[in-house]
Every structure is written in C-alpha cells, then in structure tokens.
Design a protein with these regions (language model features):
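N-terminal and secondary-structure boundary signal
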Residues: 2-351
C-alpha cells in the first residue's frame, strides 16, 4: 500500500514477526539475522516505529526505516497540529516541525506550505501565540491559514453515503493527488472522537463555516452528532496523505485535546497509511492507561468508531495482519509486538 514516489523498505528493518524468531537467537544471532530479508508476504502497510528519548533521533530513525523516498521536486503541503494555543502534546512540537521539514528537503521536495484551520480560535492568533510565524520564516515555509481563504478557493466534497448531511467544504488544492505530508500528535479527546491522531487531524482541513454553503457551521454538525467518530473517518475520503509522522514522544493518556494526563512513550511512528498509524496509536494509548475507566479500553481497537468506519471505507489497513511493523532494534521490536497484540485482541468482558 505504498503511496510514495520511490518508496522501498529498508533492508535493515526488523518486522514484528521476525522479532519473535530473533528474540531466541541471542545478541550475535540477532545481529546476523538483521542482514537477511523477510520471506515474501502479501502486501502490507509499512509502519515504522522508533524509540529514543531524543526527539530528532527518533524522527530520523522512523523515517529512515521507511527506506528510499524521493518527492521528485514536487511542492508539498504540510498539515501539522495547531488546534489550540497550548504546547506539545496539544500541538506540534517546534523541534518536530523543524526535523520533518529538514527530512523532506533532503528527499528532494520543492516548496513547502504549512496549512491549518485551528479549532479553538483564530489560526493566525494561535500561530502567533505558539511562535509559528517566526519558525516558518527560519524554515522558509509558506503559511496558509485556511480561515482566511476566499470562497473561490474552496470546493465541495459531497461524500455520498456518509453521515454528513450535505458533505463538507475543503480547499481546492486538496484532493487525492495532492502531495500532502501530515504531522500528528497522539492524545485522548474528551470532546468527541475518543482519540486524536491522523484521521482526526484531517478535521483541520475542513471549513468551519461554509463559503459555498454560506454560513453553514460544519463543526457544529460534527460535534453535535452521535456519529462523530464515523464522520471524522469520512472526511478522509477527500484526500490521501503521502506520509504521516506521529510524534508520540509525549501523549495525553486521558483528557485532551488541549490538556490532560501526560505519559511519555518516547515513540515516533511513520507510515503512508493513516489507518494503520492510528490503530497503532490507539494501542499505544491503551498501554499508557489500563482499566475500564479509560474509554479506549472498552472496545477492541478496530471497534473504535473512527477506525471501524475508516476500515469500511478502505482508507487503509483493516487489521494487524495488513500491517508490517519496521523497527531498528530489539527495544522497538518488543513494543511493536505489544502493539500488534493489542490491535488483535478483543476487549475484556465487563465484570
């Protein structure tokens, strides 16, 4: 399911299935086994996982695990997470933005345009409070606050058969051929959707107030609906990101999206499959906080509304069997094995 130009697996990557064998080989055997290639399998969504307390090293390791990526000089849109004026993990960490931009430039991209529609205030105001304009100037990024786009730069996405009453409006530049890279955080979400990762980050590409359907409040429709999780997934039919980087160095294990209980997995995930990366993210959140009081623990991973609907819409991997974890070391492989187990398991029965 690779969707990147010249995107190939790294020969040194370790899959979860390989790890199960290698764990019994000892240090020497593990080093030797890493030189081999995995047996031929059915197509999988590649999901790179890196663990490192140093953010830049974790980002670099995860992205390098995905192998050779060449954007062919194409201009890119970059969707990070600037939903509120609160610091990471509520919003994108400035070091993450800087590291990802550096990686994209090393992989032969053209101009990079950072786009956003913040949910908890004016995008420009939130950017100012977070110091985004200054950082964008240092990184030579174009900035586009979607709140300020005129009507002629929006288009209607009808989404037939969805839970949206009259579809949605998205910027004209956004379609399934757009070269868009996404940086998402990982957190629980107490206002709806239960969790926020890649699928939910796409809501920041949808108009709050209609330009073509003048004055219509799309976000009121979303947040008042009992089908909010499904609607979040349905928005993702409007486009297909070429690459997603999930910064889970810190997460909100409860609360969210702007504040909550902090946990520190020190993990970065990268993939071209937003469903696979969100499934792994949900599993990672469940590791941070066990027990039925954690809403994510009450359903199996793929029974979460966002992921269930995303799988129905064929937006990405539909089970752990369609994912292939790539890791660089035994520590990462052990975590990947844990995550895969959580993704596969059924929820515990209520007592």
């Amino acid at each position: 399911m690779n969707r990147l130009t010249k995107f190939s697996a790294s020969a040194g990557a370790v899959t979860r299935r390989e790890f199960a064998h290698r764990a019994g080989l000892g240090i020497a055997g593990f080093a030797l086994a890493r030189r081999g290639h995995p047996a031929q399998e059915a197509p999988h969504s590649q999901l790179a996982l890196a663990r490192n307390p140093e953010r830049r090293l974790a980002i670099g390791a995860a992205l390098n695990l995905l192998g050779r990526i060449d954007f062919g000089g194409r201009d890119l849109y970059l969707k990070a997470n600037f939903n509120s004026p609160d610091p990471f993990p509520a919003t994108t960490h400035p070091d993450t933005l800087s590291a990802v931009v550096g990686f994209l430039r090393e992989r032969n991209c053209g101009r990079i345009t950072l786009v956003e529609r913040s949910g908890m205030g004016s995008t420009l105001d939130i950017w100012d409070k977070l110091g985004v304009p200054g950082l964008a100037q240092q990184l030579d990024l174009n900035l586009v606050a979607l709140d300020d786009l005129p009507a002629e730069q929006w288009r209607k996405e009808d989404l037939p058969g969805s839970n949206w009453k009259a579809g949605i409006e998205v910027p004209k530049f956004l379609d399934r051929d757009t070269y868009l890279v996404q940086i998402c955080n990982l957190k629980t979400h107490r206002f709806g959707g239960v969790f926020s990762a890649s699928l939910k980050n796409s809501i920041g590409l949808v108009a709050k107030f209609g330009r073509l359907n003048a004055g219509y409040n799309y976000m009121r429709e979303l947040h008042s609906s009992s089908q909010q999780g499904a609607m979040i997934a349905e928005v993702n039919l409007a486009y297909e990101p070429k690459l997603i980087i999930m910064d889970a160095m810190q997460v909100f294990a409860s609360g969210g999206p702007e504040a909550g209980e902090l946990a520190m997995p020190e993990v970065v995930l990268a993939s071209a499959d937003r469903v696979a990366i969100d499934a792994a993210g949900v599993a990672l959140l469940r590791l941070q906080r066990e027990g039925p009081e954690q809403q994510l623990n009450r359903r199996a991973v793929y029974e979460q509304d966002q992921l269930k609907r995303a799988a129905e819409l064929d937006l990405g991997a539909k089970s752990a069997d369609e994912m292939r974890f790539l890791t660089a070391d035994a520590r990462g492989a052990m975590l990947a094995s844990q995550l895969e187990g959580i993704i596969q398991e059924l929820p515990k029965p209520k007592k």
